[in-house]
Amino acid sequence: LSFKNLLIALNPSSGDGSGQSSSLPFLFATTFNAQLGPLSLSVSEIGMSVDLSFPGDGGGNLGIINLSPGFKPPSGIGLSLDAGIIKGGGYLQCFPERGEYNGTLELGIEGLLTLNAIGLITTQNPDGSPGFSLLIIITTEFNPAFQLGFGFTLNGVGGLLGLNRMVIAEKLQDSVKTNAIESILFPRDVVRNAPQIISNLQAIFPVKQGSFLVGPMAKIGWGSPSIITLSLGVIIQLPDVKIGILGVLKMVLPDEDLALLKLQVNFLGIIDPAAQMISF
């Protein structure tokens, strides 16, 4: 059992002068991961709320104070199961008051493939007005990989689709430095790492009505098992054309699951015709 953070929030309100009580609503919540055999559990922001109020007539359950505790349901729950041949899991995150619904899904079949999917849906614009947006990333990694000749293999394919979403070049550049780029290119353990992956994607691809994204991805390897891998993606924004070419080059020995030596290079190139800019 590992705790990721502790949230303590306070939103005081005052009475309206008509005898209504002023209150101090406290919120205590935490995010934690737990492992029980083959089952992994991730729970986000579960805890309790405490409403501390001061009735104008002094008729509280603690004299002049009224204390009302309550349960705060989690904002997200994830489950992951490793049952040998078949591995899978999912994560769901809901914020109805903000119109945000996010989820991740993973499915692995030993000796065949691993499928990961991430979806972000909003029904409100950032200003609170009604508006729909969607961001989906789907990746598939093959096991064993497809042989391409000369020691090269096709390890995986994937894609990104965004409706009413845009890409922020500066955030994409930051993702290269912070390694958040791996939240886009063939992310691993999408259920266990769902809160961080979703947060990264929301920052890089915010809502913008009338803007669309499309991005094919591929993962190429060399060696068997792959000693060197190149994860490459091209993200295209329309109609305000902006193109991002991003990649992760890795060399691991003897393999990624038990790496004694790991070298990694993240890179990004941006083509912005409107700004007449090409950067790498």
Language model: regions and residue ranges:
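Extended assembly/interaction regions that build large supramolecular complexes
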Residues: L1-F280
